[in-house]
UniProtKB/Swiss-Prot annotation:
The gene is glmM. Binds 1 Mg(2+) ion per subunit. SUPFAM superfamilies: Phosphoglucomutase, C-terminal domain, Phosphoglucomutase, first 3 domains. One of its GO terms (biological process) is UDP-N-acetylglucosamine biosynthetic process. Activated by phosphorylation. The active site is at S102 (phosphoserine intermediate). One of its GO terms (molecular function) is phosphomannomutase activity. Belongs to the phosphohexose mutase family. It is an enzyme of class 5 (isomerase). It catalyses: alpha-D-glucosamine 1-phosphate = D-glucosamine 6-phosphate. This is Phosphoglucosamine mutase.
Length: 451
């Protein structure tokens, strides 16, 4: 069996790659593996899902697998990924299961597992679960019978409990703020408008009528056009877009301009430093964050720590160093004082709280970061490792770094899943960034031609 878990759990085309049989196998293996630490009681699992039509099918398979392994299940229904993590911790469950493929198209789905406390699983535990699936394929576990079979409890007020938790974290009420929220026809459709209204905002909601088929369909954080238009039409101070499982938050100013995760992080970092809650005056971001963020934070006296690409690496750094804020340009923002994973609705609340507290517009607050023009070229290659480290490629990168100096940067990264090398260049002008990126891309193509 190849590697089953990717950077964000198990994902694939539902009922083709991610079948009910595979979902059941993952659930059984997870129940056995994650219950090993404490055999004094039957394991307890919290299970939630987003709005994809396939979620009901996969939920049934996962619940069957868990209960057949002796685990009791708290089924919470349609909720955001961070809500499932929160309820896993609140219920003192042994683990949590979220069925979602986040921002991916509707036909995809995924299985994301949380450890006790609502934290993402470490790589070594995922590897143990994979090994258990392989072992069970040839030697079946002894299954409990009678009273040993797990039971299922439906939690009906999970959404309300989660909303109250979110609103309780807000440092300043949102009275006077008018916001348009794009719920991506996903897991945020109920809780995001409810949380924003509860905190005092006037809310206009769009793409908040999921039908199982329309999740992420030309809406949400990856498709901002409808939100940008709605913000201007309704005269709102801002717009907020979530993705299918609501772990992302991307914003739009009153003029309809995008405010990305880098700018949101900068706004929150300054707010938290003023409040004395930005531990060590440090922000955690990935290497894909725009150089403009680093320049802005340096100017403001805030240290920026960079990690590999992926919110799991941001989370690891936050936990290891005891820091209070981190995230990605894509809108995954993590505030460990209030959540164990990226939480789009939490981020939206704190962003609007800053607007309300300062009386400034989102455009004014976002202006702390001036993003540098960025060019990204995905170069098809025969061997992505060779294409990234060939001497001629490295020489061209070094030449570019000297040319750009402190006013730009180069990031060369082999894709983790495709035969591509990603060439990213930031510079003072888009023309210069494109020229430099094309030169490097040409060297990559020469070093590792396709075919």
């Amino acid at each position: 069996m190849g590697r089953l878990f990717g950077t964000d759990g198990v994902r694939g085309r539902a009922n083709a790659d991610l079948t009910p049989e595979l979902a059941l196998a993952v659930a059984v293996a997870a129940a056995h593996t994650l219950a090993e630490a404490d055999r004094s009681h039957p394991p307890l699992a919290v299970v939630g899902r987003d709005t994809r039509a396939s979620g009901e099918m996969l939920e049934a398979a996962v619940v069957a697998g868990l209960t057949s392994a002796g685990a009791n299940v708290v089924r919470v229904g349609v909720l955001p990924t961070p809500a499932v993590a929160f309820l896993t911790a609140e219920a003192k469950a042994d683990f949590g299961v979220m069925l979602s493929a986040s921002h991916n198209p509707m036909p995809d789905n995924g299985i994301k597992l949380f450890a006790a406390g609502g934290h993402k699983l470490p790589d070594e535990i995922e590897m143990k679960i994979e090994a258990a699936i392989e072992a069970n394929a040839t030697t079946a576990w002894e299954r409990p019978v009678g009273a040993g079979v797990g039971r299922v409890h439906d939690l009906l007020d999970g959404a309300d409990h989660y909303v109250q938790h979110l609103v309780g974290t807000v440092p300043h009420r949102l009275d006077g703020i008018k916001v348009v929220v794009d719920c991506a026809n996903g897991a945020a459709a109920e809780v995001a408008p409810a949380a924003y209204r509860e905190a005092g905002a006037e809310v206009v909601e769009i793409h908040a009528k999921p039908d199982g088929l329309n999740i992420n369909d030309e809406c949400g954080s990856n498709h901002l056009a409808a939100l940008q238009q709605a913000v201007v039409e309704h005269g709102a101070q801002l717009g907020i877009a979530h993705d299918g499982d609501a772990d992302r938050c991307v914003a739009v100013s009153a003029d309809g301009d995008e405010v990305d995760g880098d700018q949101v992080m900068a706004i929150l970092a300054l707010a938290m430093r003023q409040a004395g809650t930005l531990t060590a005056d440090t922000l955690v971001a990935t290497v894909m964050s725009n150089l403009g963020l680093r320049i802005a934070m340096s100017r403001e006296g805030i240290r920026l720590v960079e990690t590999k690409v992926g919110d799991r690496y941001v989370l690891e750094e936050l936990r290891a160093s005891g820091l209070a804020l981190g995230g990605e340009q894509s809108g995954h923002i993590v505030m460990p004082a209030h959540a164990t994973t990226g939480d789009g609705v939490l981020t939206g609340l704190h962003l609007m709280s800053r607007l309300a507290a300062t009386g400034k517009s989102l455009a004014e607050l976002a202006a702390v970061v001036t993003p540098l023009p960025q060019v990204l070229i995905n170069v098809p290659v025969g061997d992505r490792t060779v294409g990234a480290v060939a001497p001629a490629v490295r020489a061209e990168v070094e030449r570019a770094e000297v040319e750009l100096g402190d006013a730009g940067r180069v990031l060369l990264r082999p894709s983790g899943t495709e035969p591509l090398v990603r060439v990213m260049v930031e510079a003072s002008t888009e023309t210069l960034a494109r020229q430099v990126a094309e030169r490097i891309a040409d060297q990559v193509r020469t070093a590792s031609p396709v075919g």
